[in-house]
Amino acid sequence: MQGGREVGRESVSDLAEELGEGSLHPTAGGQSGDSLERRRIGYDGPVILPDANANSSRLDEGLSSSRPHPGELGGGWGEFEGFQESSAKSEEFSQSFELLGRAAECQPLRTPSTPKEGGSCQVQQGGPWVTGTAAGPSSESILSYEKVFRLAFQEVPVEQATEDVCSLDRFLETGSEETAPVPRLCSESRKLWRALQNTDTVSASRCLWSESHCRENLFPVLGIDAAQKSLSGDQGHDLEGSDCRKPEDLLGVSGFHLHHCKALIQTKLSGTSGSRQGSLITYSLFLKTPLQGNGRYITIPQKKIFTPRNLKMAFFNNNVC
């Protein structure tokens, strides 16, 4: 038993010295001789404890199968090989960046007059869209935004069109020629207005009322209810159901107040009867006002409801003709 243990210890120690990776030591004091402690620096692998009854060939075979890759372990706490490789790669990158920087520095120093030297790089200005001979880069900047836009977007000449556009000063100026024109009065409205003004003479007050469309337009302007007008043509014919009284007779009527008169203006038509051309009329206006309480209406004859100016403006502004 002791001979087998010694052979196992010698083979393990020899193998550890060859690899230079770790060593197997017996436990302190030699008290536990059956178990061996395997110490490793920089490797976390499975610990193999050889059996006392196993032969040396089986122990060697187990250690060789669990042996790690030589590049995976370092020599103790030495320098890490991966870090050295990364530093070498960084040096290669720094060299490549220095070469690119030198190539970029030589570009702005080039002028169109200098001859082309061997190994020097020259950038064609204008981009791939420029046709013809390539112009050399300027000393200020190789690719300026202004030149790029001018080459990409060509300027197209546009003809200057003269438009008749009024300026603001022309609108603000008030000249005599820009005054609003006075509306011309219709000739038929003038004839009607003259006929209404001259009620004394028969020739001036007569007009062809049935053939004129002024009749339909005049009644709404005067506020006359066209459904209740009388076209009988009798002289002095009053409206049906109207109680015609003089203003002084209305003073004794209870509940009558002149300021409460809200007008429904009607007319009494008069003219010559038997005319083939229709009724020739003169006008008389009546103010119809209600009585309080009974719902009856009193018609008050008023011949000057409208002033001449107001009546004239009502005629011409409402297009009676």
Swiss-Prot record:
Record-annotated membrane-spanning stretches: none
Record's compositionally biased regions (Polar residues): 53-67
Molecular-function annotations in GO: clathrin binding
GO biological process: intracellular transport
GO CC annotation: AP-1 adaptor complex; trans-Golgi network membrane
Superkingdom of origin organism: Eukaryota
Region described as Disordered: 1-85
Ranges annotated as biased composition (Basic and acidic residues): 1-12
Pfam families in UniProt: Clathrin_bdg
Coiled-coil blocks: none
Protein name, entry field: Uncharacterized protein CLBA1
Lineage: Eukaryota, Metazoa, Chordata, Craniata, Vertebrata
